Amino acid sequence: FIPVEVMLMPEASPFHLSKVSYWSRTVMVPLFILTSLRVMAKNPAGVNVRELFTVPPEQQRDFVPVASPLQHFFKGLDAVGRSFEPLIPQFIRKRAIKKAEAWIIERLNGTDGIGAIFPAMVNVYEALGELGYSPDHPYRADTRKAIDDLIFDHGDAANVQPCAWPVWDTCLGGLALQEAAGTGDTPAVRAGLDWLAARQVCDGPGDWRDFHPDLPGGGWPFQYANDHYPDLDDTAAVAWAMYNTGDHATYGRAITRAMDWLIGMQSKNGGIAAFDSDNNHEYLNAIPFADHGALLDPPTADVTARVLALAGRLRRAQDGPFIRRALAYIKREQEADGSWFGRW
């Protein structure tokens, strides 16, 4: 139980939206609306996965495993919250729903979809419908197209991919071609990097700006377009491939903006995350909603190491403090057997 009134909590609140990852935010906000309006799921075709349940799903009551005192606490808090929900004044609920609606609309992202990820798009499509938007309204129509673009129909079967990842594929393909050719600049590599250069996110809104309002942009998203949520890992890879060309007249400004943005996004512990800074509020992974254990976007050794590698290539004198803090983080994160955990 997470009521839509969460949208009204101040930034200092332990449950403020900014304390979870971007993918969690974009999935949760429309879900707040759907749960607060008590929307019933529609399943006219009767699709189900009953064979996966040892207890019939309609009889199952305890979906959330509890393994720690904190999980016990949040499960109790969940029960208390449900019992008090009817006491929430309607004017507060309406205000919270309006704020959630505005949050969604700002991030709709056209036909690329909110967050450019399938789960968020589906929730948004349904939430907008419950808020009175017709299927042919541009907000819903664009969202539906974003969903349909991720569905692959094979006639007797269909599959859905969670997102598209052309920036990642293009920069990794470019790096592979550079390695194979023994040179950083070939026509194929140049074509890919020029395509990428036009997609660098330098201006405009982004959730990362909530904590870095004065930091100039310079990242790339994972997908075709996802300006609110550029990806630090992708940004390092693109800048690396651009640097390898040796053509700093063409790509130098993009590389500089990318590295400056990456440094500005360093977390307080010295590490680098995928999309955010200091998104390491581990207690939130104990709430019942976070049964998958991936609610957060904390710094990780693998992303930090790749950004460090880029900094080593660029050899900029001003990056020394960043490098020292990142190296200290990497050393602290080493496992007892000498390895490092790789999330991404």
Q: Residue ranges of each PLM-predicted region?
A:
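Preference for long, amphipathic alpha-helical scaffolds in soluble/luminal domains
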Residues: 1-344
